Amino acid sequence: MESPPLTRPDAAATTAASSEAGLKMAGLVEPEIVAACEQAVLRLYHALDRADYATVLAQFAAEGTWQRGPALLRGRQQILAALEKRSATQVIRHVASNFLWSARDGQEVMAAFYLTVYHSDAGAPVALPVAIDRPFLAGDAACRLTCEADGRWRIRHMAFDRVFEFPA
């Protein structure tokens, strides 16, 4: 379910030069922008866990990039191609927490957060709940979101660095 767009009066004023300028943070992010951006990130992971790839893709800008392991996926087509290779029998949950938000300008924000992943794949469909003894992995995630012309905040770039792996 899509949330209504958060319209910014200066949404059309973004230029490629201003949105791609250096990584200097401009400061705090307005609460309504934090809410809209956090919903985009959480909506992505909720959809990813349920193999709802159309909703996952809708959270990315058309030219968005996603660093997934060693692969840098560029654009929605590459992202979809990678997602379609995921196991249809896995049960997975991504838990995003401890968000820190910074503004670059009125049209772009950065987020740093923790991501813990719980995973099981028996190779065949299973009944819930699935018994596991530990998380699959945990680490640091980051993303950059931009306010697009339609007033929605979408992910321009997302990356994840593994910090903890849990032996089987």
Model region roles, listed by residue range:
Residues 2-9, 108-110, 133-168:
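Short beta-strand edge/turn micro-motifs at domain boundaries
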Residues 123-131:
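Short, surface-exposed loop/helix-turn segments at secondary-structure junctions
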Residues 53-121:
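A solvent-exposed, acidic/Ser-Thr-rich amphipathic alpha-helical stretch
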Residues 36, 93, 137:
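Soluble or luminal CAZymes and related metallo-dependent hydrolases
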